[in-house]
Amino acid sequence: MDRRFESRLDEMMDQAEVTPELLRGLLPRLTLFLEPFLQSLSGLEKKQRALEYTTGLISGLEHKTGEGIAYLYDQDRQGIQKFIGQMPWDHQPLLRTLAADVGNDLNEPDGVIVFDPSAFPKKGDKSVGVARQWCGRLGKVENCQVGIYMAYATRKEHALVNTRLYLPEEWTKDRRRRKEAGVPQSIKFRTRHQLALEMLAECGRDLPHTWIAGDDEMGRPSGFRLELRTLGERYLLAVPSNTLIRDVEAALPEYSGRGRHPKNPFIRVDDWCAKLPEDAWTTIDVRDGEKGPLVIEAVKCRVQARTETGGTGPDEVLFLTRERQADNTYKLDYYLSNADADVPLEEFARVAKAAHRVEECFKRAKGEAGLGDYQVRNWIAWHHHQTLSLLAAWFLNKEARRGKNTDPRADVSATAAVDRRVDRLIPADESEHFPLPTEHALVTAQRTSTLLPLSFT
């Protein structure tokens, strides 16, 4: 990380403050926030349970499990656990509403949709979808579940908007495990990229965007890039360092006069990068106002990439970035895009950094909204918990921006009109039934949101 950025980060952390006015009326605002999401739930009990569970997710509980949330309300844990793991309610309408709300709030025509997998380490073999697979959190192959997430990023902010649980092929073929975990019969094996395309088809229209981005797991298959191209989407996807590319801008080998005209050979993208002269790199000062400087260097070039079947892909733009680390080494990232070659380096950099910033979404959701705190094993419980956690994270996102951009006291009186509805669903005395270490969540959200939006000047 740039030292100037570290210094600015320390200053902002010292300045972060949550006032009592910001916390006052929090639960009535949460109730109002949840109303459009819970319209698809039938019956008052489900709505009340959803409110209780979401309240627990934004609370100061150390472990935001169903059991912990039940204890928060001094209730029998079976009621909460039944709501999450057994009650038949469809989570998809809530996620569609979430995408629409995020798209409306953060709306920018050149927004970025980001796909990113995230793993949850698990012990045993009973949790739905658990298998030995790559776990980024641990940096190795481990026993874990993997969710594929869809996020939306603009200069204003960014948020997770949808998710799918990746079900390994070994699971889809095992009838016993499927039955025990309650996997619906309609669920067939789908690759992580197919899950991403499903979410794009479902929510893409609600998220104004001109870019699709993702990490090197998403960018590796040429077939996924082809699908996006076919859909008319413009992408900037990270690719692994061993991706084979051919420089189509380089001079061709001399023709011998016989046979086919020679072409430049395919080489690894990191080897191609290593041969670049120093003057090939352009310095870009990525600024986000008061939120700290970030200096990177970048290069772009038209290339063709080798496909998995050994064929030659269409022309794409190779975009490279490097950032100097504290030890004076460089962190290198490699991307392929179907954008026009004349797209400015600064625009490619904006999209690349927006994709990286989604990691902050995971940190918030896991650290403050209990995304990974679940202790459930079956299919619907995983999706129910994940859905409500994404809603909780989005609520905290909104609260952080409300506290930063407006006078919190102006909003307190606005909750009076809904107090009667709120009293039916939550305890009258917030301080008694709801632990307000939620302040920690809002401080953290304010601090991270201060760092996230990117603009270029």
Locate predicted features:
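An acidic intrinsically disordered interaction segment
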Residues: A16-L26, G111, F348-R364
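Basic, amphipathic alpha-helical segments enriched in Lys/Arg and hydrophobic/aromatic residues
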Residues: L371-E430
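Buried hydrophobic packing segments
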Residues: M150, M199-L200, A365, L391-F395
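An anionic, glycine-rich sequence signature occurring as long contiguous blocks
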Residues: T31, K156-A181, Q185, F189, ...
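Short, solvent-exposed helix-loop connector elements
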Residues: S337, V343-A352, G367-H383, G403
